Amino acid sequence: NYHPASEKVQALDEKILLLRPAFQYRDNIAKEYENKFKNQTTLKVEQILQNQGYKVINVDSSDKDDLSFAQKKEGYLAVAMNGEIVLRPDPKRTIQKKSEPGLLFSTGLDKMEGVLIPAGFVKVT
C-alpha cells in the first residue's frame, strides 16, 4: 500500500537497510551522470520507505552478504537495487552543437546540451 510523498504515515520502529545501487550501464556514460542517477534513485526509494513510516539506514555496500551480523540484527529488512540502465539524450530537449575546429584549444568534438533520460529496469529486492 503505497503512500504518495505528500502523505506520511505513523512512524514505525522498524529500520530498513538501504544498500547502494548496483546498476549495469549499457552506454559509455560519464561517471558524473552514473553517480547522479544512483543518488537520485536512492533518494526516491528512501523517500518512499520513509513515507511508509520506516527509518532508513543507508549502507555503503551493494551486496546483502557483505552486511555485518550487527547490521543484519539491527535492520528489519535489507533493500537492494540492481538493474540495467541506458542513459540517452532526450531528442526533444537536447541540442547538439558542432565544434569549431579553427578555434584555439578546440578539441574538434561536438558539444551537447540538454537532458538525459533513463531507460531500462531497476529491480528492488
From Swiss-Prot:
Coiled coil: none annotated. Its main location: membrane. Residues 92-97 are annotated as: N-acetyl-neuraminyl-alpha(2,3)-lactose binding motif. It is a lipid-anchor. Disulfide bonds: none annotated. It is found in: Cell outer membrane. Pfam families: NLBH. GO terms for cellular component: cell outer membrane. It comes from the Bacteria. Keywords: Cell outer membrane, Lipoprotein, Membrane. This is Neuraminyllactose-binding hemagglutinin. It comes from Helicobacter pylori (Campylobacter pylori). The lineage of its organism: Bacteria, Pseudomonadati, Campylobacterota, Epsilonproteobacteria, Campylobacterales.
